[in-house]
Amino acid sequence: MGIKHYKPTSPGIRQMTRHTFEELTSTRPEKSLLERLTRKAGRNVYGRITVRHRGGGHKRMYRIIDFKRNEFDGIPAKVVSIEYDPNRTCRIAKVVYANGAKRYILHPVGLNVGDTVVSGPDADIKVGNALPLENIPVGTIVHNIELYPGRGGQLVRSAGASAQIMAKEGRYALLRLPSGEQRKVLLACRATVGQVGNLEHENIVIGKAGRKRHLGFRPAVRGVVMNPVDHPHGGGEGRSPIGMPSPVTPWGKPTLGYKTRKPNKKSDRLIVSRRKK
């Protein structure tokens, strides 16, 4: 995998960088693992915007990813291709099990076409293998971590992400997450060995607004240039200050450092140390 730079033939191209996609081995996805993806544009079932700055973008099909890795325990699966997924930052690997079943999994660093992966409690500590945290040694790098046994991986799934098992105590394993947060996770939860691939993703420069629109993002407008009806910072004659001691959100809550986490959240007891600021 690498990054492609361009000659500055236009202002948009000047700083722009792209992936070379040299690690991909297949351009056509597996039809049996595709689903229609309906665009929501940030709206809920009532048609109201619940996530701002979403909409448009290229049409996509959803690739069904096996986040659980518990369907074929002990059955080896061969990696047959590494593919692009428009719905996530990392690449995906198509694996074919010995019984003929096909699945997509997240592609970790070091997993190549022709390699074999296994899931289950007796799997080896090898990149791409998925097993319960109780069977993974302390110090191992993992990704695609479950929060509840059997629910499927929910943590550490984006490009280049990894967590490390720091300790085990009682029913829990202590993990250091990419944010720096140290959190307890049940030992019965599964994780996949290795680091998520596509390490160069963080070095990609979008370069121009049109590329961002192509990805499905709409412009973010500053509150200070809105009208008073649209934002607390809005209004005034010409270029005016926000007119209040500290910035607030469009709904009037303080921002820039204001803590929004619920003070008595259930999972607080599982967080040993919060993320680094």
Curated annotation (Swiss-Prot):
Residues 226-277 are annotated as: Disordered. Keywords: Ribonucleoprotein, Ribosomal protein, RNA-binding, rRNA-binding. Pfam families: Ribosomal_L2 (PF00181), Ribosomal_L2_C (PF03947). GO terms for cellular component: large ribosomal subunit. The keyword rRNA-binding applies. GO terms for molecular function: rRNA binding; structural constituent of ribosome; transferase activity. It comes from the Bacteria. One of its GO terms (biological process) is cytoplasmic translation. The keyword Zinc does not apply. Part of the 50S ribosomal subunit. Forms a bridge to the 30S subunit in the 70S ribosome. NCBIfam families: rplB_bact. Belongs to the universal ribosomal protein uL2 family. One of the primary rRNA binding proteins. Required for association of the 30S and 50S subunits to form the 70S ribosome, for tRNA binding and peptide bond formation. It has been suggested to have peptidyltransferase activity; this is somewhat controversial. Makes several contacts with the 16S rRNA in the 70S ribosome. This is Large ribosomal subunit protein uL2. It comes from Symbiobacterium thermophilum (strain DSM 24528 / JCM 14929 / IAM 14863 / T). The lineage of its organism: Bacteria, Bacillati, Bacillota, Clostridia, Eubacteriales. The gene is rplB.
